[in-house]
Amino acid sequence: MGSLLSNGGFNTLLIDLRNNGYSENVSDFFYLGQMEYNDVLGAYDWLIEERGYLPSSIGLVGLSTGSLSAIYALDESDIGAMWLDSAITDFPLVVRNELGRLGYPEFLASPTITMGSRMTGVDITERDALDVASRIGDRNIYLVHGSDDSRISTQHSENFHNIAINANTNSTLWLIDGGGHIDGIWAHTIDYQNRLVTFFTNSLS
């Protein structure tokens, strides 16, 4: 993803969220963006305060579970635009789908989420990505999702897109026919890069 953007003429900052890659391991848990979005905001603040970027010239890319951190960061900033690929936008839906995929009854979703919050010490439903979709305003967003994604259903991107559209946000949804999870960047690289670069070129100032 970084190379697609840099080859398209964009300065690109790649970050590892807490407990990932080269970043510090501060706990044994992943907080589904509820804490990690602060890492994105830290990078955003650094670009503004140390490098002199304008908020409206900064865009976000979120992939899969990382989309939650991007969405929550967008909600608490003036970031100019956001690109999401195979996004999670409804955590309870993820839990229900995963339970069903594993052969367990979906009514276990609620107690599973409650137990997750108790284990992590963080309310993992405190922020709601679908609520954010109604508050994006005139900023542009672009959602990409493979129609055959077996891990994160297209319903996530479709619901987020529909809420954003109803709130008069300029939202685009690209459903890739037959695509899997984060599959478009590999299966349709040229088209993917063209869409990505065009989107940010037109969306950032």
Model regions: which residues?
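Conserved alpha/beta-hydrolase
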Residues: 2-24
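Alpha/beta-hydrolase active-site loop
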Residues: 30-51
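Alpha/beta-hydrolase fold nucleophile elbow
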Residues: 51-63
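Hydrolase active-site cap/lid region
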Residues: 72-122
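Short beta-strand/loop motif that positions the catalytic acidic residue
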Residues: 136-137, 142-145, 149
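Short alpha-helix in the alpha/beta-hydrolase fold that links the catalytic acid
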Residues: 153-163
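Catalytic histidine neighborhood in serine/cysteine hydrolases
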Residues: 164-182
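Catalytic active-site module of serine/aspartate enzymes centered on a nucleophile-bearing elbow/loop
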Residues: 187-205
